[in-house]
């Protein structure tokens, strides 16, 4: 992996105890984004905190976050960093929505 911003995003997720972290290069599937990152956390509160950490990392790398969808009671928080879309789920929601299945024709890279 050569993308510094992606590395920084993945590192902040690892440092803050996200589980089951994967990423996909979606440029062939979605011309509006480069990477989708998906991870699992143990609580809604942890999800919101991680969303804020990801926002900070992207901002420090010159990426303006377009939107953070969700709040401290959400089971799924999406951080829209334009080229870097980060999906943060509590476990039950990740299973229920099964996002990885939607992109099953793309390589899914596991982290950690």
Predicted region positions:
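Ribosome large-subunit tunnel/peptidyl-transferase-proximal elements
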Residues: 1-52, 56-66, 107-112
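Short secondary-structure capping/turn micro-motifs that flank functional sites
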Residues: 30, 74-75, 95
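Mid-chain, well-packed structural core segment of small domains
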Residues: 57-89
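Short, intrinsically disordered/low-complexity patches at protein termini
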Residues: 71-73, 102-103, 110-111
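C-terminal structural segments of small proteins and small subunits
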Residues: 78-107
């Amino acid at each position: 992996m050569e993308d510094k911003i992606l590395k920084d995003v993945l590192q902040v997720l690892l440092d803050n105890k996200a589980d089951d972290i994967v990423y996909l290069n979606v440029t062939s599937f979605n011309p509006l984004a480069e990477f989708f990152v998906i991870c699992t956390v143990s609580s809604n509160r942890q999800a919101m905190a991680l969303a804020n950490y990801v926002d900070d990392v992207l901002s420090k790398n010159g990426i303006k976050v377009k939107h953070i969808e969700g709040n401290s009671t959400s089971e799924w928080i999406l951080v829209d960093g334009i080229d870097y879309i980060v999906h943060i789920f509590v476990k039950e929601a990740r299973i229920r929505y099964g996002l990885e299945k939607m992109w099953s024709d793309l390589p899914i890279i596991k982290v950690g």
